[in-house]
Amino acid sequence: MFDKHVKTFQYGNHTVTLETGEIARQAAAAVKVSMGDTVVLVAVTTNKEVKEGQDFFPLTVDYLERTYAAGKIPGGFFKREGKQSEKEILTSRLIDRPIRPLFPEGFYHDIQIVAMVVSVDPEIDSDIPAMLGASAALVLSGVPFAGPIGAARVGYINGVYVLNPTKAELAKSQLDLVVAGTSKAVLMVESEAKILPEDVMLGAVVYGHDQMQAAINAINEFADEVNPEVWDWKAPETNEELVAKVRGIAGETIKEAFKIRQKQARSAKLDEAWNAVKEALITEETDTLAANEIKGIFKHLEADVVRSQILDGQPRIDGRDTRTVRPLNIQTGVLPRTHGSALFTRGETQALAVATLGTSRDEQIIDALSGEYTDRFMLHYNFPPYSTGEVGRVGAPKRREIGHGRLAKRALLAVLPKPEDFSYTMRVVSEITESNGSSSMASVCGGCLSLLSAGVPLKAHVAGIAMGLILEGNKFAVLTDILGDEDHLGDMDFKVAGTTEGVTALQMDIKIQGITKEIMQIALAQAKEARLHILDQMKAAVAGPQELSAHAPRLFTMKINQDKIREVIGKGGETIRSITAETGTEINIAEDGTITIAATTQEAGDAAKKRIEQITAEVEVGKVYEGTVVKILDNNVGAIVSVMPGKDGLVHISQIAHERVRNVGDYLQVGQVVNVKALEVDDRGRVRLSIKALLDAPAREENAAE
């Protein structure tokens, strides 16, 4: 019934198993990948026909996590999985990025990849198995895919690279890097690091690429065994006559356009060139396919002009050489009522970054397959359509916005203060108000500045820069601080963020095969030079953390004995509610007895802290207290005196006065304030007090007689 094929190989400390032919047999190809107890089912479906008018490659990647994989039932009212989580979106992008450049130009058939996590080992992340499964399934589907690709996670522990580290190992690692590529070249890198030098980062990329050959070889052997039917697809031939016509009509205008340094004016000139081509070559009788071909030729012509100018040593689109960073403008404290803000402008790219401080109650609760946890630092990136001068939809963040926000967040994580040193929850929002290249790296710079503006004691300043590459044969040029057009028309997008001491995040997407270790070395060195230049200007604008905003909450931390937590909370929360209401504060109590008080003023925080200290204080034997009589006991035994909130003691009738007391009521009344001395606290916490011990003893009668 099943034509099942299985391939097993060792990958670091894990055994990986690839299986096909048993599940999802109606898909073009389906592979079940097991890595330890983590199992991912990846299915590829294709469309043999191209949609009419299609002029781009419609690749869709969806990575989905099923809660049953971790033995859980979804929370919420509906009790089923809903929209994709941030982790699912980021992993979908991680699968997509190294695969997309391996499809040939002109291939416009629909391809859909669905990677579904059906079992999860909390120690083994499902992203690497999902990437390997997508690679294997594409090879088995027979589509014109220049793979397979391999994927590896690399850690760096005690100066040693670790292949596919577990979650426990990653907690000790200075690096979390995912690299993907073919047998010959690296195609994608995604990483965060704890301020590591460039050579260590490059070494990790090379190490990961070397190690992933085991996975690539296994997928090739697996495909040989399955022997899939390969598509008979040929790339459309270039219409040289049509290319010559388009060049003749628009070639010179395109060259003139790319000498214009201002983006909007340049775009207007390019529109003029395209309108001339449309008027000459596209009529009402021209079908969509032919129109798309003409449009494609025009775009190629644009790329040829930009690329050849740069490789010939001519100035770039905006007049810069290959190593110059665009002019910077840095302003902080630009929004009066926010906790921290910065406006970071680099050329025609601008980010308005705003930092907000909160308490532990504001931490984001993340219900992941591996377990629930909280996150004290959030960075959200917004890319409104007006940032590029366009009209567009405004709504929920797109995948790109989530990916860019995650990269900027990873860049800043290494310099955040420890929770014990700075117990605030932090949120940064980066509003991209202008965009012409590398808005994610502007978010890193702006995010760092806004945190400093909010008074966050960062360990160091962090800056980011985007690098580009143009490669033709043996000639290449590495570009610093790329523009949007250079990103689209170039061969690499290489983003590096870090401090003066090292790298905190690195992201690389390569559109071609053939980028060598030497080119990556040059790009990293050039990126460092640019990063240091930006850091100098950032430090000149903001040397260190500013004073806490008057509008930010003040946090006061204190530690109490765990046995006292119940007393602070009170019956049904009565005590803690009264403290928060009377002092206007917010109080959080951790299980270990750590109390965090959030207040808008120093006075309110001090008042709440004093109340808690009074509640949790112990009565000390021998100490004198000012107390209030709260009750006269029956049978003339004595009186109960409150010496501090929640702490009462007994003044026995014999401890009221030196003379014989016949009636307690003759000496004490409820509400009377008296000074008492603590005589004893027994094993059950009962307190004995004395008024008499503070009174002078009367002179003896015989002394008086003399």
From Swiss-Prot:
Pfam families: KH_1, PNPase, RNase_PH, RNase_PH_C, S1
GO terms for cellular component: cytosol
Biological process annotations from GO: mRNA catabolic process; RNA processing
The S1 motif domain, residue ranges: 622-692
Location (main, coarse): cytoplasm
Record's keyword annotation contains DNA damage: no
Documented EC number(s): 2.7.7.8
Domain KH: 553-612
Protein name: Polyribonucleotide nucleotidyltransferase
UniProt source species: Neisseria meningitidis serogroup C (strain 053442)
Source lineage: Bacteria, Pseudomonadati, Pseudomonadota, Betaproteobacteria, Neisseriales
Gene that produces this protein: pnp
